[in-house]
Amino acid sequence: MTRAATSEPNSAENPFPVRAVAIRVAGWIDRLGTVWVEGQLAQVSLRPDSKTVFMVLRDPAADMSLTVTCPRDLVLNAPVKLAEGTQVVVCGKPSFYTGRGTFSLRLSEIRAVGVGELLARIERLRRLLDAEGLFDPRLKRPIPFLPNMIGLITGRASAAERDVKTVAAGRWPAVRFAVRNTAVQGPNAVAQIVEALRELDRDPEVDVIVLARGGGSVEDLLPFSDETLCRAIAACRTPVISAVGHEPDNPLCDLVADVRAATPTDAAKKVVPDTAAEQRLIDDLRRRSAQALRNWVSREQRALAQIRSRPVLAEPLRALTARAEEVHRARSAIRHDVTRLTAAETERIGHLRARLATLGPAATLARGYAVVQTVGAGGPHVLRSVGDAPAGTRLRVRVADGAVAALSEGPTDGE
């Protein structure tokens, strides 16, 4: 049998009964006293026949919630109408109900978070995100000129969805959309928008994502200044266009997104080109190109005409004719000089030939001289001494008109 309290330590052999644990937990929580809590109302259950109102207070940044209860009169006399999405600050005492084992906060005071306070918090978050570099223009991704498919996150059957799709189709009839309808205000908006954003970012066919919502109060647009949503937009690989509210509205998602559009209609104009405008541009470019080509041809024709009008091209043989006489005179002079030089050289060669004939052996032989050569095994040799022609030596005697053979009888006396 187990006991609520024992001197022995708690263990599997000595467990606490449920009532003991519940009473201890209730005691710990009861010692907390009253606490101030801020959150967003996610559910308000106000039954006509009940004096107690049950509500759920949610923390959008952490996706956590807390059950709260309060007297009916406290809700009816609240400074603002309490509804889902209302940001409030409450004072209450934590309670643990031992019978059901549930935790709740019993409220004694409810205060609405004023617009000024909301704006101040948004400004503090803006400074934080700016300091982290989430607004850096260098991180902005370019929007494709003609996206294959456009991801559109907006409220179901909303004017923003109708405006974006109608204007985009009017500008580019072949445009395609992947639409994700989500809550765009209230406690569930941030979670649904972030989920849709991540889903479209994973889709390889989606080239750009448009986040669209019409105008509204600061409270209505509060989800679009949520830190979780801003960081989800910054983490996207797909370019994001923020088209939330109207021109004066400036939620933080506008600063994180790659492109800010003043309205959903403006987003449609930014995301796809205008077919008519592009056709006009093409026609204008073709017209300007044709005119530029015609101007170029005209300039080249004028330049060619100027070149052809020059004397050297108008009468190309004129220069040759002017130089023909000069060439003729030069040719005659060359011929005269060549003839004169040829005659002089011919005469000089004749003189040299005559001198050569006079000094040569043939001229000596013609004057009656003879050349005597010995004939031997080594070939003929000119006889230079009588000692070279002993008796019996064969001789060859060359005269002017030929040669005769002779035989030496040896040296003789006398002349």
UniProtKB/Swiss-Prot annotation:
Principal localisation: cytoplasm
GO CC terms: cytoplasm; exodeoxyribonuclease VII complex
Pfam families referenced in this protein's UniProt entry, alphabetically: Exonuc_VII_L, tRNA_anti_2
Family matches, as CDD domains: ExoVII_LU_OBF
InterPro entries given in the database record: Exonuc_VII_L, Exonuc_VII_lsu_C, OB-fold_nuc-bd_dom
Nuclease is among the record's keywords: yes
Group of enzyme by EC: hydrolase
Keyword Cytoplasm: yes
Reaction(s) catalysed by this chain's protein: Exonucleolytic cleavage in either 5'- to 3'- or 3'- to 5'-direction to yield nucleoside 5'-phosphates
EC number: 3.1.11.6
Record's subcellular location: Cytoplasm
Alphabetically ordered keywords of this record: Cytoplasm, Exonuclease, Hydrolase, Nuclease
Gene Ontology molecular-function annotations: exodeoxyribonuclease VII activity; nucleic acid binding
Family: Belongs to the XseA family.
Protein task: Bidirectionally degrades single-stranded DNA into large acid-insoluble oligonucleotides, which are then degraded further into small acid-soluble oligonucleotides.
Subunit details: Heterooligomer composed of large and small subunits.
Entry protein name: Exodeoxyribonuclease 7 large subunit
Gene name of this polypeptide: xseA
